[in-house]
Amino acid sequence: MMMPELPEDLLVEILCRVPATSLKRLRSTCKLWNHLYNDKRFKSKHCHKAPRQSLILMWKNFGFSSISINLQRVSPIEVTGELNLIDHHSSLGMFRNSPLCQTSGLLLCVNVEKINTRLVVWNPCTGKTKWIQHRRMGYICNYALGSYQDKKSDNNSYKILSHGIYGGQEFEIYEINSNSWRILDVTVDSSLYIENVSLKGKTYWFATDGNDKPCDLFLICFDYTTERFERLCLPYQIPYFRNTSLSVVKEEKLSVLLQPSLTSKTQIWVTNKIGEAKVLSWIKFLTVDLKPEIKYGIKFLVDEENKVLVYEQNFVINGKNNMIYVVGEDNEVREVVFRVGLKPLFFYYVPSLTQIRQGND
């Protein structure tokens, strides 16, 4: 007995609640499902109603992989999938792993070939890309990707923020909707760190006031709607930190790792859900005793459910390099066997059907 066909409006209501990764596998089931997968209105509905499934992505050996880390026991990292950037202009093999920024299921990668800088905004779930030429040749920049609510379409739209790394604080904005760069009329007196993360329409950096005297570290965020910077306080203030790092918790919260100088005691703090309150508040997640030989460059993830910190270190330490560590409330540090390439960079990624506007779309 054949199953009756569902009305299209009912099918839409069902499929818009299916996670993006599962929907990607289902698109080959029939022409209608494949059509919905590419339909702009369906994608917009899906972004609002579909459950968020967080993956761990790793950049390694000039490519991306999805990975699984067993938090309960010591076991090798499992590579669960490979993600390929397909475009006739270039290949991911020519991309450097830093800077790398992501928001709303989109990744921003930067390719520098001699004096030519090219950027690509990429949705790994849909495979769609948008290639962008930076108008300044031979100018070394830091980049960030963020979103804002477009008043005309009432949909999320995207901008890229760039600023010089070595000298100068001139900021430029690239609007994906208009395919154009423009200089941003803002002045920032602080010195921004290179590392940044984007969350809920804003990008965050560590920053200092940039004078020669000991000065407190703080956060600066850039709002892509107002195109203005805002200064934010960290959980506590001291003149010197040995280690600092930023991370995003499943596209909902901001997390910071703070290790004061002359100690291995490290605190991990997590904010309230970004966007749900006007005031940013901090909750101490863990205090752990990281190895004192850990140097600058630590990257980390927070697993709130299992109450553990996962961090990696790319420097050679006691003959070891590229190690991943898992540490929990018991302060027991476990080394995870790492066999997936050199100089990894890993982060939480939430797949989505987010569209990338192309030219006259």
Swiss-Prot record:
InterPro entries: F-box-assoc_dom_typ1, F-box-assoc_interact_dom, F-box-like_dom_sf, F-box_dom, Gal_Oxase/kelch_b-propeller, SCF_F-box_component. Gene3D superfamilies: 1.20.1280.50. SMART domains: FBOX. Pfam families: F-box, FBA_1. Residues 1-45 form the F-box domain. PANTHER family: BNACNNG10540D PROTEIN (PTHR31672), F-BOX PROTEIN CPR30-LIKE (PTHR31672:SF13). This is Putative F-box protein At3g25460. It comes from Arabidopsis thaliana (Mouse-ear cress).
